[in-house]
Amino acid sequence: MTVNSKRIPFGKPMLEAFCMDPEYTNLNSSSCGSWPKVVSKQIRDYWSLLEAQPDLFSEFYQGLVLQEARLGLARLVHAAVSECVLVSNVTTGIFTVLYNQEFEERDVVVTLSTTYGAIDHGITSLAETRSFKTRRVEFELPTTGEKIVSQFETTIAQIRAKGLRPRLAILETIVSIPAVRMPFEDLLRVCQKECIMTLVDGAHSVGQFEVNLQELHPDFFVSDCHKWLFVPRPCAFLYVAERNQHMMRSAIPTSFGFIPKNGNSQLPLWSQMVSANGTASSFETLFAYTATSDNMPHLCIPTALRFRRDVCGGEAAIYEYIKWLAKEGGDKVAEILQTEVLEEPGLGAGADGQMRDCGIVTVRLPLAIATGPSTAPAHVPGGALTEKEVGPAVRYLTKALADRYKTWIPIADCRGWIWARLCAQVYLEVSDFEMAGNALKVICEEILSREMGQEISDSYRWHD
């Protein structure tokens, strides 16, 4: 499908190219994402083709487009196409890698205190039936990248001092919430020096900032495409360095590409799904046909990439704008609330820290938690919230944002305060962040004055 090559300015003009309700302000790209109308039309066209000739579409046509999608992603992240396969989401990709590891009893999987909850649970679940141990690198935000790296190195030394082997480290590019960019490049270098395998959770990466896997050199890398790349959900890809592909014996679920220890993989004779030229590796074959799946989001990757190139002006322009907007918008929200953004402590005025080198910003709300650490002041206008009040307050806040302001903002607690995560995007402007800041200010004042009402909206209520 051809994308209209006319460049559209970022901000409000770009919003018309997307599927969003014009009355809705999407400040949460890093959860559900969003995609342009041309991609929406593309997925509907593919559905029509599938339903018109289901077998012919599935067995002949979609394989060609999926190969094009993998090629586009490989170019985007500077990797070989033979190292990139398509999966439904990051959690699936990460668990697939973990499932295929042959752990020994002295092996340790190293995580961070900021590791995404679903990943943490997946590791705990697997450890119940596999012979490996887990160790978490503990630190509290806000902190500096140097301190995180130092604590990581200390933890590795402690593991080895006990006669154990740090086998695999799970790193993240951006913490989900409270959102900050991690020093993953430095952590990767430490792991490479220490001969520790690396599995990078890049859920919030591709489409938000440049990812160069040739330079990073991870063992495994997974990223969602539906968060920042303008692709329908769910959509992700898994990168496995060629040197490690022998470890990957099964996709999830196990299907025709599985290679028995004393045999070969055999796709059905009728399947044309692997590649147009039939030169796919065993690793590619493993993920080419994993039972009946919804491949529609993956089929839209080429259209999304063309839109980003032709209509948005290219990846570099997108990265520059959303990083600038997150900085300006986040500062504006903090100014309205008279609080602060989450970043490295002690940064001078106008200094740029690594933790904000992305399109997401986390801003402290004027809502302290009474049982928080000493970093929370003794006096807050209206008084601090008790632990019992926090849950109802957050529910009230998010519901009021939805009902009154037609937006939604993720909320988290950190070091005795409640924080809000806001995402920049090409169809947003600083004025959208100003709206969010003013909305948060009004609602927080209601919470602190204990004037919370019963926020109910029939438009958001599920019906049987």
UniProtKB/Swiss-Prot annotation:
Record InterPro entries: Aminotrans_V_dom, PyrdxlP-dep_Trfase, PyrdxlP-dep_Trfase_major
EC number: 4.4.1.-
GO molecular function: lyase activity
Practical and industrial applications: Loline alkaloids show broad-spectrum anti-insect activity, and different lolines may have different biological activities. In vitro tests of NFL, NAL, NML, and semisynthetic loline derivatives with long carbon-chain acylations on the 1-amine have shown that many are effective against both fall armyworm larvae and European corn borer larvae, but the effects seem to differ depending on the modifications. N-Formylloline reduces the weight gain of fall armyworms by deterring feeding, and does not significantly affect corn borers.
Modification type N6-(pyridoxal phosphate)lysine: residues: K227
Keyword Lyase tagged: yes
Superkingdom assignment: Eukaryota
Signal peptide stretch: none
GO BP annotations, alphabetical order: alkaloid metabolic process
Stated induction or repression of this protein's expression: Expression is induced in loline alkaloid-producing cultures as well as in planta.
Pathway(s) this gene product operates in, as recorded in its UniProt entry: Alkaloid biosynthesis
Keyword DNA-binding: no
Reported cofactor(s): pyridoxal 5'-phosphate
Swiss-Prot/TrEMBL keywords: Alkaloid metabolism, Lyase, Pyridoxal phosphate
Family: Belongs to the class-V pyridoxal-phosphate-dependent aminotransferase family.
Protein role: L-cysteine desulfhydrase-like protein; part of the gene cluster that mediates the biosynthesis of loline alkaloids, potent insecticidal agents composed of a pyrrolizidine ring system and an uncommon ether bridge linking carbons 2 and 7. Lolines are structurally differentiated by the various modifications of the L-amino group and include norloline, loline, N-methylloline, N-acetylloline, N-acetylnorloline, and N-formylloline.
Protein's recorded name: L-cysteine desulfhydrase-like protein lolT2
Gene: lolT2
